[in-house]
Amino acid sequence: MRRRTGPSSTTLLLSDGICCDGFIYKYLWDDLARMASVAHWNYRGHGRSANPADPERIGVDAHVADLDAVRREIGDPPVVLVGHSFGTQISLEAYRLRPEGVRGIVLLCGSYGRVTHTFKNSDVLANVLPKLSELATKHPRLTRALWSRVPPKTALRVALFTGEIDPRTVNPSDVEPYFHHVAHVDFPMFTRMLAAAGEHSAEDLLPSIDVPVLIVAGDRDSFTPPDLSRHMAETLPKAELVMLTGGTHVAPLEQHELVALRIEKFLTDHGLA
């Protein structure tokens, strides 16, 4: 975990997507620290965190418990939960677990759940993942070897070529660390974690969330189709939706200045910083 004390006692607690270790917050880290205190942590088996002692403890509930432990470790200050991608599910469930002290939520390019059923507006990933997970379990060394041998620069070029990230607005060097980190994440763990995320849903919680929520979405995000963000905005009692024109799943990097300004406005409007 890393932390920076800012001008406000409120702490913006940042959660990542699966296979991420903070690359998405490269610019927001400094921008947000000018508004409030900030803290960022790593999931089990990600970044500086070791692989889980129990390989089955990799579901949403385990990560939510870890986030709650982080809140207590930093002194249990008032927090605004900030989540990107899978981190939106974690932030929502962290509110369910212990809403006390949560003053607001910021959801970046993420959904309330069942992500493998909506990826690219299809359930293909949900159907393929069980066989992939079975293969990883039966042949862990083989799948780890194949997974780790995909050159990060090649993966980056594919993402740029296919439009999964916008080559006009993103600096490739901002995204390359993600592909380097992915190569070092344990593949069997990744498949189990993704499967758990794909079957989890916090949709039932949305109508009862009684704090301001900012939803930032990209209209070209194929990982989290924008209609899911619109649905969340319509269901949450105190939600604001910002739809970024041309934004993909890494919009916090592509349009980081606009995202920072919009978060600052949200925090100011609601007296959160």
Listing of model-derived features with the role each one plays in the protein:
Residues 2-51, 70-71:
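Conserved HGGG/HGGXW glycine-rich cap/lid loop of the alpha/beta-hydrolase fold
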Residues 40-86, 98, 261:
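Active-site loop/oxyanion-hole signature of alpha/beta-hydrolase fold enzymes
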Residues 77-121:
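Conserved hydrolase catalytic core segment
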Residues 103-145:
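Flexible "cap/lid" loop of the alpha/beta hydrolase fold
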Residues 116-120, 143-208:
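Conserved alpha/beta-hydrolase catalytic His-Asp/Glu region
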Residues 209, 215-217:
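Short beta-strand/loop motif that positions the catalytic acidic residue
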Residues 220-224:
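Acidic catalytic loop of the alpha/beta-hydrolase fold
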